[in-house]
Amino acid sequence: MDRSHIEQIAALERECFSTPWSEAMLTEALFDSQASFIVAESEEGGVLGYAGLQVVLDEGYIDNIAVEPNARRHGVADELLDVFCRFGEANLAFLTLEVRASNAPAIALYRKHGFEEAGRRKNYYTKPAEDAVIMTRYFKRIGNEHG
């Protein structure tokens, strides 16, 4: 992700999430040394989807995965998640994320990539209030008893 993507990603955030990241938040994230963002683009250069990852030591937290409604069911989210999982396999003990309990397609995608439910956060989401399912994927690394 670079500055040229910010406006389109902010629009995608507004379309996909009830509490979206603003252009200012996305711009600030560009300069966060612990954050990495990847973008899937169409042949014309439009943003089809994006994903964000925060890394602290050997722990990864997937902040966001969003895909344009017209691009869904075409493997965009699958590819974005695959990039972070390959990074995790090489560099992390685990990846974790939260997902709305009602978001069955996303939960199925995460399970396909080896994530398992690790817990729930009651009323984590607003607009509407809903529980978050915490999902984690552990990687086989020396000293990682979960992998």
Tell me what each language-model feature is.
Residues 88-98:
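Conserved GNAT acetyl-CoA-binding A-motif
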Residues 2, 49, 75-77, 103, ...:
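Conserved phosphate-binding and hydrolysis motifs of nucleotide-dependent enzymes
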Residues 3-70, 78-87, 138-146:
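Acetyl-CoA-dependent GNAT
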Residues 110, 115, 135:
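Conserved active-site tyrosine of GNAT-family acetyltransferases
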